[in-house]
């Protein structure tokens, strides 16, 4: 039986390590792993296009970027579980009651659901591109938000703006 060849593009080191461990345990799948975020992930797909890749696995904005530019290769999105989001929100709440979740839809949908179910008081902002992120975070900072929970682009941008950024990490169940 032919091995399935998957190009995995984790946006952060912890997910890279998790994918490497999963790859070591699977004999039916060949995982090619390149760490990257947004355009870096797209570049990895373009560089590996001739390597007979069956599908791409990534998260959030990186998966969306790949789908938008490479319609000939299926791109699967790792969606954080509600528990992944809850874990980060609880940590953020211990830092400040002025917090927001910012990210691509795969991050903000579970956050919205969690906010409604648990009746938590935090803002949720969905972005569609890296370019939108800074303006969104500046507005939240002007509204008094101190802590941002989100994806790689949101956390990196928040830290550049002097805000606290907490990455919502995906557990092994999500990956």
Labelled PLM ranges:
Residues 1-175:
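Non-catalytic structural scaffold of enzyme domains
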């Amino acid at each position: 039986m032919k091995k399935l060849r998957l190009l995995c593009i984790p946006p952060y080191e912890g997910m890279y390590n998790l994918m490497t461990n999963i790859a070591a345990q699977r004999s039916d799948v060949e995982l090619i792993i390149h760490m990257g975020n947004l355009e870096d992930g797209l570049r990895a797909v373009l560089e590996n296009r001739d390597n007979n890749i069956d599908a791409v696995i990534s998260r959030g904005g990186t998966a969306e970027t790949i789908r938008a530019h490479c319609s000939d290769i299926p791109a699967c999105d790792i969606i954080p579980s509600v528990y992944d989001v809850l874990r980060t929100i609880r940590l953020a709440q211990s830092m400040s009651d002025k917090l927001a979740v910012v990210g691509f839809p795969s991050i903000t949908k579970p956050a919205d659901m969690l906010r409604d179910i648990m009746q938590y008081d935090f803002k949720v902002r969905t972005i569609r591109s890296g370019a939108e992120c800074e303006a969104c975070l500046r507005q939240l900072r002007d509204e008094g938000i101190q802590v941002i929970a989100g994806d790689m682009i949101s956390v990196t941008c928040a830290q550049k703006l002097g805000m606290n950024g907490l990455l919502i990490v995906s557990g092994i169940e999500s990956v």
